[in-house]
Amino acid sequence: MGASDKFIGFVMVLFRIFVFGYYTTWVIITPFIVSDHWIQQYFLPREYGIIIPLVLLVVGITAIGTFLGLVMIKSKKNK
């Protein structure tokens, strides 16, 4: 494993920690903060807290299903 692989992995972990912290703050903490507070300007409307993960879930499941379907079709052609 080269140094570039470790660096890319480290950057991905840092990005994931940032996304987790941002999403957790957005969904769990901001509903208890007054809506005209300055911190609210850094977050999308709360509806997107549900819409974005649902869209990602649907896209992910579709990609996995498509991949599995293509693998099954390809394996039948080889027989």
From Swiss-Prot:
PANTHER family the record matches: DOLICHOL PHOSPHATE-MANNOSE BIOSYNTHESIS REGULATORY PROTEIN
UniProt cross-references to InterPro entries, sorted A to Z: DPM2
Record bears the keyword Iron-sulfur: no
Organism: Dictyostelium discoideum (Social amoeba)
TM ranges: 8-28, 50-70
MF-aspect GO terms: enzyme regulator activity
Highest taxon listed in the record's lineage: Eukaryota
Pathway: Protein modification; protein glycosylation
Pfam families: DPM2
GO biological process, one term: GPI anchor biosynthetic process
GO CC terms, sorted: dolichol-phosphate-mannose synthase complex; endoplasmic reticulum membrane
Name of the protein described by the UniProt record: Dolichol phosphate-mannose biosynthesis regulatory protein
